[in-house]
């Protein structure tokens, strides 16, 4: 990739790419709208793989919270995680995201292909207090029965609550009932 020394773009869409963290910061640190799809940001010390076969070894990928810390101006954040999101989402991702001040002031936070390692319990606490950010969570198809059961319970709690003092999220996962999905979607877009 040619060297970029400055980028003042307010809106950026990146698909099917691998970047060093330094290159990513140059490209995206000033943007307000960022959409990533199948993108891996590698630790600066790692060599970016040359071939597509090498792209499935993401041990050196930086975590979502590290990535997010480099985006102080972002207001709309969408990330369709790569299929092998090893190290991008870790057990402390939800907890660490909530410590980042500009994360709490987002207009939209949408993430897809979320693996089971994501701490939905901790993030659900944030959802119930969130009054600003539209949150859309699409989970991976590869979830345990227990994790899906917890997601169903969270969705049911949200839908059964009559007086909500928070922005209703959109949560999707395989095995969500059609009626729960449709009701959540309708309420989410009314918000």
Spell out what each predicted region is.
Residues 1-191:
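The conserved beta-strand core of Leucine-Rich Repeat
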């Amino acid at each position: 990739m040619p060297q970029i020394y400055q980028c003042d773009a307010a809106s950026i869409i990146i698909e099917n790419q691998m970047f060093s963290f330094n290159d990513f910061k140059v490209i995206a640190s000033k943007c307000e709208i960022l959409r990533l799809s199948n993108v891996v940001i590698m630790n600066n010390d790692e060599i970016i793989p040359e071939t597509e076969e090498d792209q499935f070894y993401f041990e050196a990928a930086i975590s979502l919270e590290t990535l997010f810390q480099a985006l102080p101006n972002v207001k709309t954040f969408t990330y369709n995680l790569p299929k092998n999101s090893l190290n991008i989402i870790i057990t402390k991702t939800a907890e660490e995201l909530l410590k980042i001040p500009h994360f709490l002031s987002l207009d939209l936070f949408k993430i897809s292909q979320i693996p089971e390692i994501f701490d939905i319990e901790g993030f659900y606490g944030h959802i119930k207090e969130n009054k600003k950010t539209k949150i859309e969570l699409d989970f991976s198809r590869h979830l345990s029965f227990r994790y899906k059961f917890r997601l169903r319970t969270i969705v049911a709690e949200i839908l059964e609550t009559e007086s909500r003092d928070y922005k209703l999220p959109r949560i999707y996962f395989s095995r969500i009932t059609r009626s729960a999905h449709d009701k959540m979607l309708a309420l989410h877009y009314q918000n």
